[in-house]
Amino acid sequence: MSEILSPGEARSPGISYQELLDTDTHEVPEVLRLESPRFLGDDDISITRYTTREWHDIEVEKLWSRVWQYACREEEIPEVGDYYVYDIAKASYIVMRSAPDEIQAYPNACLHRGRRLKDYDGNCSEIRCPFHGHCWEISGELKDIPASWDFPHLEERGSDYHLPEIQVATWAGFVFINPDPDCEPFEDFLGDMADHFEGWDLANRYKQAHIAKVIDCNWKISQEAFSEAYHVNATHPNIMLQLGDTNSQVDIWDNFSRVITAGATPSPNLDYEVTEEEILRCAMDTRHDQDTPMEIPSGSTARAIAAAGG
């Protein structure tokens, strides 16, 4: 049986990610040298969190209606009048480029009868409800009410009939919204995460393609699968030659966490020795009928070749 360790002390056989970095030929950004392990407990998590309507409703109330959440990229709404429809749970929001340097967001529902104002992303010069035609400027002010003589009470309300505004913040080209008017400042929510990306200029990147897949599972099941490398041994055994699955480092901060899994190094779970050529071939997805793409100099490693850019 395995040795019994103190809470948070358990780790895999083989070297740690930090020890692996110590053997590398290239220095890494300081942020990759940070370590923030936290023991969050080992009590069982009830299946109800993944399967019940009651728990879903709790998340809608306490999470999706109160937390800062990524809605779209700025380059998806580059021109004035461009808008993006962001749906989460039963809620829908219009994220609008209302001026060259301003992004606003509104609930995607007409104030008259609640009909969705926009069904798809696009560009518009006004926001007109497709049901009765109540219309707002893209900046949210009331523009027109058909048969306004029958709605004197709305005319009197004036700015009261403005589309409700949802809080918006941007960081590195990402657009975030928060439906809670009393939410914490975005800067506090982001915390130190921006520091982790100082070496990666995400603001000047763009999304070339958007690929989505509907998965028949609770959202947490899907997200958790991409927050660990524990499944590699059973699900992706073909990449174990070049992936240090259990060498992974897991770090947890207040509002974000990260998992770092090293490539071009064999899994400690393998029960046989792997050559550097085998590691390189696996890392470069070389077929059995193909020659090794390059020669590894004597004394070098596949990981060093990868760090040098091939």
Give residue spans per PLM region:
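N-terminal pre-ligand scaffold of iron-sulfur
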Residues: 2-120, 166-170
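Generic, ordered loop/turn and secondary-structure boundary motif
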Residues: 40, 46, 51, 64-65, ...
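A sequence-level detector of short, solvent-exposed, charge-rich linear segments
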Residues: 74-82, 90, 129, 136, ...
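Rieske [2Fe-2S] iron-sulfur-binding domain
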Residues: 76-181, 185-196
